[in-house]
Design a protein with these regions (language model features):
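Phosphate-handling catalytic cores of nucleic-acid transaction enzymes
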Residues: 1-295
């Protein structure tokens, strides 16, 4: 359930809302004081209204709005959408086609745009946008009509086969529901996020052995899939290498969830590296299946 995944970051979203509410209360007091005293002192400067920050970006937003939200959140954002055609419909519209922004954000490449209201030129130097979608094969085809424009290779896919099984929804009497469990994990994610925000920049590295295993696997995979599917699939293999590295990075940070201070240099634990590689090998098989259906 995609809604459960959202629970993992919902506490961070709520923290953003709380901080914005505090900023607005402070702004309203400053504005009231300004209105009372501006006639007495011509040198008074009007307070600037704070802009809301949000981690989770609505997928049906216009391109300009998506970039604006990213800009106001230091270039970071997430999207959760249970219907893949929501994003596909936005991409097919005149106002909402930000698929180029998706492609750039994957590699943290700069995105620039103009604010309509004040004609301000804005640059997102290192955008970081992650998206989680669920949908049917037809919805994927409407979102990514071809596999050559670069958007396909920037997604990872997990294909869930249909099973004709009726689940007994009354079968569990456990006090802790799965929603409650994910709520608890979400609070732990918030704590980890807060600790990371308070630490200096952290460098993540693989060991020499891990690098050798990584290069050996993807070198072989590149030739295997090239012989199997041709040139167009190579971008997916190569970007899967970067995705695998990022998965290993996330797993390494989750291992340190109870730490209060983080070292400036973190080496990947062997278990986390092996898990990332296993996940990657499964994902590339699913990516191959989706690629074959779209081609």
């Amino acid at each position: 359930r995609l809604t459960l995944c959202r629970k993992l970051v919902q506490p961070i979203q709520e923290q953003f809302r709380f901080l914005y509410k505090e900023d607005m209360e402070k702004f309203n007091k400053q504005k009231a004081a300004y209105e009372r005293n501006k006639k007495k002192d011509a040198n008074l400067i009007a307070p600037k209204q704070p802009r809301p920050k949000m981690l989770i970006i609505p997928a049906n937003s216009s391109a300009t709005m998506v970039y604006q939200i990213l800009s106001e959140n230091d270039g970071r954002g997430l999207m959760f959408e249970t219907e893949g055609d929501t994003l596909a419909n936005v991409f097919s519209s005149d106002y909402g086609n930000y698929s180029d922004g998706f492609r750039k954000a994957f590699h943290h490449e700069p995105i620039s745009y103009m604010r309509r209201k004040d004609h301000e030129y804005v640059e997102l130097l290192e955008p970081k946008l992650s998206t989680v979608l669920s949908g049917t094969p037809r919805q994927i085809a409407s979102l990514i009509p071809d596999t050559e424009n670069g958007l396909f290779s920037r997604f990872i896919f997990y294909y869930v086969d249909f099973k004709l099984t009726w689940l007994n929804v009354f079968g569990s009497n456990k006090e802790d529901s799965i929603d409650g469990i994910f709520d608890t994990i979400g609070k732990q994610v918030l704590e980890l996020y807060q600790h990371l925000q308070g630490n200096p920049q952290i460098r993540f590295c693989l060991t020499s052995r891990q690098k050798d295993l990584f290069n050996c696997y993807f070198r072989t995979a590149q030739h295997t899939y090239h012989d199997k599917l041709g040139d167009d699939f190579i971008a997916s293999v190569r970007r899967m290498g970067l995705i695998t590295y990022r998965i290993a990075m996330v797993l390494s940070m989750l291992r340190m969830v109870d730490e209060k201070d983080f070292p400036e240099l973190i080496y990947c634990h062997d278990e986390d590296f092996e898990c990332a590689m296993i996940i990657s090998k499964v994902l590339i098989q699913h990516t191959e299946r989706v690629y074959t259906e779209l081609s």
